[in-house]
A protein has these predicted regions:
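N-terminal intrinsically disordered, low-complexity segments enriched in P/E/S/T
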Residues: 1-45, 60-112
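P-loop NTPase catalytic core of nucleic-acid-dependent motor ATPases
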Residues: 50-59
Length: 112
């Protein structure tokens, strides 16, 4: 997971990407965290757990960009789900590499 201090500077290192920005509301409710992420990624609203999120995120191979950048706006010290979402992204990336796609997961404490 990448820590972003300056969004524009960070994004300038990529040429062919699709950006998803997630305002993380819940730092302690897993279902709410997953629901927020699913909503931003345009995934079905019935996704309630990590396995379901993995299954649905595999559909991101359809995104017309090589890099799928997800920036989570949250406090990394307080968000207990960052290691879980990192594992989810790692698993999904194994699938996406067959389609020349990759998810880049980043975290930022503020929208700059």
């Amino acid at each position: 997971m990448i820590t972003v201090k300056n969004k524009n500077e960070f994004l300038s290192s990529f040429s062919n990407y699709r950006l998803f920005e997630v305002e993380v509301v819940s730092l302690s409710d897993k279902r709410e965290f997953i629901a927020t992420l699913s909503r931003v990624l345009n995934l079905p609203t019935y996704v309630l757990n990590w396995d379901g999120l993995i299954d649905e995120m595999r559909g991101l191979y359809k995104v017309d960009a090589e890099k799928i950048i997800i920036i989570l706006y949250t406090d990394p010290e307080k968000n207990q789900f960052l290691s879980d979402i990192s594992e989810v992204v790692e698993t999904v990336n194994e699938f996406l590499k067959d389609f020349n796609r990759e998810i880049i997961l980043a975290v930022s404490e503020n929208r700059v």
